[in-house]
Amino acid sequence: SQIELRVLAHLSGDAALIEAFQRGEDIHDRTALGIFGANSGLDRKEMRSRAKMVNYALLYGKTAFTLARDIGVSQQAAQAFIDAYFAGFPGVRVFIDRTLQEARVSGVVKTIFGRRRPVPELNSSNGQLRAATERIAVNMPIQGTAADIMKRAMIDVHQALMAGPAGPAGR
């Protein structure tokens, strides 16, 4: 279902990402075409696999260095993939920047449903701590919202089962 990427589409408002989901496109194929192009020399399966890693790498705040290591390319190539991704989905870059800016001011990030997580280390003078907190600040609204959606769905299913023919006595 790619729920986290769907949540990202909603939160970022990125028109291309939203359109891809509305059309029922495979988002990893769409990303592959955008970052590798039609004549990359890679087969579709390999392109899709790498594009999937790029899609999720950016959700989790990976850098060109870590992405390069994960997909077995040079750091320069990984940076080119990241740049191509943001060129194809510019609303995602805006979302990341806006989320970090708002979190630096408020000290918290939130899910769509209002669940909050403090991120006081965003303004830390310790670069490693600040970078780790930036990854948390960007990821939490996405992953947290996806988790909230799944938890609400489980509650709805449980209530429907309890109200159904088997009901509580069917346990």
Put a short name on every predicted segment.
Residues 1-171:
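Conserved catalytic core of nucleotide polymerization and phosphodiester-bond processing enzymes
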